[in-house]
Amino acid sequence: LHWPERKTNFFGRLNYKHKEEDSWNDFEKVLTALEKFIKQGKIRCIGLSNETPWGLTKFLEISKIKNLPRIASIQNPYNLLNRTHEVGLAEISVREKSGLLAYSPLASGYLSGKYRNGQMPKNSRMDYFLNFGQDIEHLMLKKL
């Protein structure tokens, strides 16, 4: 599953503000739908992407209570510049045996060295998506 359905912080957005009317609580409904795909042989297991510690915990809790499929993995960013997985998700992943599939291991290419000294190689990701490079990883790399 890619992106939580509920309102939460994505891509480094800070200052989470909870509003009761934004509450989303369809964890069981989602797991039940995915269970049907497993029984039909269309998928073997399920994972989450860009999920928070609370969201992963909630999916695991509902799957245990309702005897529904467990979350096998979480796919979130993890690299030398973005270590947010370690602040809550790492412990849950280990204790609940829900593996990490790290994406952006080279910090969108910044750790490869190709953007060093302001270089912008033609046909690179940052050449195509100019605003994409204005994220936290880019700012942190400048300090190295």
Language-model-detected regions and their locations in the chain:
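Beta/alpha (TIM)-barrel catalytic core signal, keyed to glycine-rich beta->alpha loops juxtaposed to Asp/Glu
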Residues: 4-144
